[in-house]
């Protein structure tokens, strides 16, 4: 699969605009971190010892980290010398820089979602982060699979199966809280659904542009879709933080 060279300048321009928007959102979050006082406790337990809070996560600051990771990734991909390397890789149907960015934004986001839904055990949070990041990094392997059909989607399928596990943990905690009469707030519930839908959209886009959108523009279109999904992800995070704050 190849990329139309005429579309590469557009890709760099879109990345530059996206970087500016991510940066603006990140600055809003950092500026509001002082007054948006949502602290999410993290607990550490050992056998026979009650779980005790040993740290807390500032929601606004953590969300700012996610957004600024996207800002830095998109900015560096839009200027030389990395711009040319990214274009060269995309021309070969490979989007390693995108997977590096997504592995961090997706994993930190699902950890924040887990914290908002009451998952506070440090060991569980570390496992959630590792599973989410590892699932996305399998897409780096998927880029190197050229066989059409199901046999060429082994890495994608494994990544999707692994990536849904952290969200399953979140769902389990939501259901448990409903059963004990302590449901999460409407903002947290809506934010969880929105971020889950965007996570699913990222994976669907990978499958769609590989299996259904077979054209000379498929890789460039996939990159554009990823950028737009990333912007929607930032908007959803920003909305959740501001509404909870």
At which residue positions do the language-model features occur?
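Polytopic alpha-helical membrane-helix bundles and their juxtamembrane interface segments
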Residues: 2-95, 106-245
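Conserved, mostly hydrophobic/aromatic
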Residues: 102
